[in-house]
């Protein structure tokens, strides 16, 4: 294609809406500490930066889109003109969890963080939960999910008492061996907990954590299920639903928004399964929003401080991304981002999420790329971009839809400042 044809295609795409937006959230793949990270005990944490320092990474597709143009990443050379637009965004809301991040992407700012329980849940909460499920519980403390089933798994198998635990995030997690407590019964317990945990104890998520295996080799199974709460205000998925725009959720998306605004959805067993379902959605869904969360980075590697596993998972995603990019049409927009960080660097002993910027990569085959989106003041800028594309608007955020053509230049945010990287 000649240069004039490229320019004509870019101008046309900038003037008309993309028929389809594919939004992929790489759960916990942050890109450096936010200015207020010290308030969360996260000064110096940098998920992508530290994984890149751990060894050379093979990420040719992410680098081609502009990942290494956002921040310097060890062993990764930024292209002079990446194929995509690139930037990073701050989380405006207090907190550093999945719900806060995804809600903000959709235009919901929280005034206060979801409650956390560094010393376990209040005795009255646990007592009422035990009364309603008809059995005692074990644990009730912050813990790594893999470590607590090592510690208490045998006692759970012997007694049948479910293991209740939390973390540095706003979660009430219930672990049970599938041979001792059926998955259906575990889900019922989670539904009871979700109804119980309201008011001042309204945690962001109740999570079912089934596991199996013999003593000494317990392992979590993929039948995890999240029970969230409704977003408190109208948000992107409501706007799209009202406008008749289809929303297809992949992975945890349905659970994170408590089903609000999500039409059809597909759960996933792994990142590879999530990418396979994204491929299927490209074949079957010609328009609307395809919204996915790929959780392995967080669940399998970030919380477990497995920096090598995190590196391999990024490389796996990059390999799968290469073929995916070939399937995109001129009327498609792909956005790749994260919801928070979860730095696996062993120098930080905590296994909790980290308060970090998230990367933004935006790619459309019809656009020239190479656009610096700068540092965005809120994750809601991405949601506002999607909303504007489909003719709507959400309460917060500044759209960068027009910037993607490279013709609009840098704009000032209504609720903060954008600066060049």
Regions found by a protein language model. Give the residues of each.
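Feature captures the catalytic ectodomains and active-site-proximal regions of enzymes
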Residues: 2-421
